[in-house]
Amino acid sequence: ERLELLLSIFAKGERPSGSSDPYALRRAGNGLLQIVWDRGWRLDLSRFLGSAVEDWTALFPEFAIDSSALHQDLCQLLRQRIVSQLEDEGFAPDLVQAVSAESVATERLLSDPMDVRERLDLLNALRQSKALPALMAVVQRAARLAEKGDLVETDLNVSAVVSPERFESPSETAMYEVLVQLEPLASGRRYRD
C-alpha cells in the first residue's frame, strides 16, 4: 500500500518539498522502512523499486513515465527517510552519518536497509562500551593511508590489497592478521560475532 502510494504520486510528477507533503509521502516512506526493519527483511529496495517502476511503466504507457528518473527520485526519498528516521529514533547524528553519509552510494544504502540498521546498532554499542574511539582511530588511520594509494574504496578484500612483506613493525602484522580474521565476518554481515 505504501509503495503503491509512493509510485502513483511520484509517477504523476509530484514530490514532497520543504514542509509541503500533501499526500504524506514521507510518512509512507517511513512506514515502508519500518516494516522492513520490524520484520528483519533482507530486501534490496533499489532493485525492488526498479522492478516496480518498470511494471508501472509497462502498465501505464499513456503516462509517459521516465522510469530512470522515477526510480532515482524514489530511491533518493527513501535515502532521506532512512537518515531522518534513524535520527528521529535517537541515534547520534554522527553515527547515522557514518552508515549513511553522502559518500555511501544510494544503491549500497538501499541494497539492504536491515544491514544499515545493524551497522548502526553495532556502532552505537561500541560507543556505549567506550570501544568506539580506539576503533575510530584505527579506521581513520587506515582511511588516510588508503587515500594515498589507488585502492577502490569499496574493496574490502584485505589479502588482495595488502602486501604483508612490506610491513615494518609487528603492530602492522598484528593488524593485518586481525583484519584477515574479520573479513569473512564483515562480508557475511555478521557484525557481532
What positions do the PLM features span?
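Amphipathic alpha-helical "coupling" segments that flank catalytic cores
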Residues: 2-193
